[in-house]
A protein has these predicted regions:
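A structural boundary/capping signal
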Residues: 1-95
Length: 95
């Protein structure tokens, strides 16, 4: 399945929460792993545009602002990641 189809499939079932980019990213990475056995990474840092703590997904070495897509917002970026997690590391540390 191509990248856009994976994103569209996820977004068709996902209901995002305002100001919770980490949840959008976590659920997308979880979906990719459980439904398609695709590994992706959660990236946390200060966003370039909004200048807030923010999360994006790194899928095949390409950053994806899944939260902005889910919310219908302009995509943001993280230039200097503070943390990069795979799904297993994130779940082990946070749940």
């Amino acid at each position: 399945m191509d990248r856009q189809k994976l994103i569209d499939e996820f977004l068709s079932k996902f209901k995002p929460k305002k100001d919770q980019s980490w949840k959008s990213c976590y659920f997308f990475v979880h979906h990719l792993k459980k439904e398609h056995n695709i590994d992706a990474h959660l990236v946390e840092g200060i966003s370039r545009i909004a200048k807030v703590d923010y999360w994006i997904v790194k899928l095949n070495d390409i950053d994806e602002d899944i939260h902005a897509k889910a919310m219908g917002l302009t995509p943001d970026f993280i230039d200097k990641p503070e943390l990069i997690w795979n799904l297993e590391e994130f779940e082990k540390d946070n749940f």
